[in-house]
């Protein structure tokens, strides 16, 4: 068993780390304060090939793998969790289902644009009345001739309002419940598609989260993803990989908080020596580092399994569960190490703490992860 990263993975880590340090970090606090999405940053990520990391060159990607992708999300999230989740949602939630379930025509048209970063992607599953219970959605799609007509709404859409392409799930046969859900590719310019309110959030504030609405939205049948009734399966398989993207985001947030806390602890003097030398602080730092490393290993393992074509659903759920809890614990401890300064916006740890909370909620709450894991253990 080899735990070393390949030369390619190390090269991608350095590339993204340098980009994050010089292009993302300088404006992270300002974008958070202003709740501002920076499309130019997305273009710069595209120019570096980050928007197509795991996809074949035939579809505009760079032909790497899912481990390279989670490394990129981790490095971005160390300085800005909003930028990390922008890439995660774009690749895991929009591009992946197209790659896995799209026709050749759909992949050539849409996956290529997404991989090249010419278009931004999003995923629309959650509704106001169906969060964890995705099978109870109310959005409908009625087949009329060569089109489907969608009616309903979705909430908490990452990249909402800035995305060009949405993977949308709607009910085509209410009698079949989960087996009556179908997936569609919806472009932002389709007639009857609207962006609703933008959420005011605790964290990841420069990542837009919006409602989207369908009012007799006409979607050509050629834009159906998979067969009728396969939507729920597509959604669940998509979330298997998406969870590991969020785990990578959580690891990045936690590492960023630890780096800041460690530097501060070395510089801050109390009672004649740095607080890093005080056992109470030193032990906190040791625990934080250990939790992060364990979470990182789980995340990389899940990515390796997916890249190797092996079952990865359980590993992905475990990585998100562990990394989400780690991010919340580590960022809270980082604020504590900073003391009163940690509670101010003069330092980034309060932002890390606010950003960490969402990793325990979206793409399946911690409770849902435990449910997924326990069911797989019982099989």
Swiss-Prot record:
Cleavable signal peptide: none
Question: Which keywords has UniProt assigned to this entry?
Answer: FAD, Fatty acid metabolism, Flavoprotein, Lipid degradation, Lipid metabolism, Oxidoreductase
Mind telling me what this protein is named?
A: Acyl-CoA dehydrogenase
Q: Which domain of life is it from?
A: Bacteria
Which Gene Ontology MF annotations are present?
A: acyl-CoA dehydrogenase activity; flavin adenine dinucleotide binding
Q: Which co-factor is required?
A: FAD
Name of the gene: acdA
Functional pathway? Lipid metabolism; fatty acid beta-oxidation
PANTHER family of this UniProt entry? Answer: ACYL-COA DEHYDROGENASE
Asked whether the UniProt record includes Flavoprotein among its keywords, one would answer: yes
Which Gene3D superfamilies has this protein been placed in? Answer: Acyl-CoA dehydrogenase/oxidase, N-terminal domain, Butyryl-CoA Dehydrogenase, subunit A, domain 2, Butyryl-CoA Dehydrogenase, subunit A, domain 3
Reaction(s) catalysed by this chain, per the record, are:
a 2,3-saturated acyl-CoA + A = a 2,3-dehydroacyl-CoA + AH2
InterPro entries attached here?
Acyl-CoA_DH_CS, Acyl-CoA_Oxase/DH_mid-dom, Acyl-CoA_Oxase/DH_mid-dom_sf, AcylCo_DH-like_C, AcylCo_DH/oxidase_C, AcylCoA_DH/ox_N, AcylCoA_DH/ox_N_sf, AcylCoA_DH/oxidase_NM_dom_sf
Keyword Membrane on entry: no
């Amino acid at each position: 068993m080899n735990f070393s990263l390949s030369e390619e993975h190390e090269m991608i880590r350095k590339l993204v780390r340098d980009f994050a340090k010089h292009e993302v970090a300088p404006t992270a606090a300002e974008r958070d304060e202003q709740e501002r999405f920076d499309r130019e940053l997305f273009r710069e990520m595209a120019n570096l090939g980050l928007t197509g990391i795991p996809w074949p060159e035939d579809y505009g990607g760079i032909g790497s793998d899912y481990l390279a992708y989670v490394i990129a999300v981790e490095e971005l999230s160390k300085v800005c969790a909003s930028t990390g989740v922008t890439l995660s949602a774009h690749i895991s939630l929009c591009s992946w289902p197209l790659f896995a379930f799209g026709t050749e025509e759909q992949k050539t048209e849409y996956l290529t644009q997404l991989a090249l970063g010419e278009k931004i992607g999003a995923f629309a599953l959650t509704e106001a009345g169906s969060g964890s219970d995705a099978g109870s959605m109310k959005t409908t799609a009625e087949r009329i001739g060569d089109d489907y007509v969608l009616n309903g709404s979705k909430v908490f859409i990452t990249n909402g309002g800035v995305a060009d392409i949405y993977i949308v799930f709607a009910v085509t046969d209410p009698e079949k419940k989960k087996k009556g859900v179908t997936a569609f590719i919806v472009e932002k310019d389709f007639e009857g598609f609207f962006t609703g309110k933008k959420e005011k959030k605790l964290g990841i504030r420069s990542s837009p989260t919006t409602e989207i609405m369908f009012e007799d939205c006409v979607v050509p049948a050629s834009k159906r993803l998979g067969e009728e009734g396969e939507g729920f399966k597509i959604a669940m398989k998509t979330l298997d990989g998406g969870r590991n993207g969020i785990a990578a985001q959580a690891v990045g947030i936690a590492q960023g908080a630890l780096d800041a806390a460690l530097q501060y602890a070395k510089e801050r003097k109390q009672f004649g020596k740095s607080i890093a030398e005080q056992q109470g602080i030193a032990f906190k730092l040791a625990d934080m580092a250990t939790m992060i490393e364990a979470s990182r290993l789980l995340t990389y393992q899940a990515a390796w399994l997916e890249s190797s074509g092996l079952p990865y659903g359980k590993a992905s759920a475990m990585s998100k569960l562990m990394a989400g809890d780690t991010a919340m614990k580590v960022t809270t401890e980082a604020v504590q190490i900073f003391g009163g300064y940690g509670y101010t916006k003069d330092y980034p740890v309060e932002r890390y703490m606010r950003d960490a909370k969402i990793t325990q909620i979206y793409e399946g709450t911690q409770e849902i992860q435990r449910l997924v894991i326990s069911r797989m253990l019982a099989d």
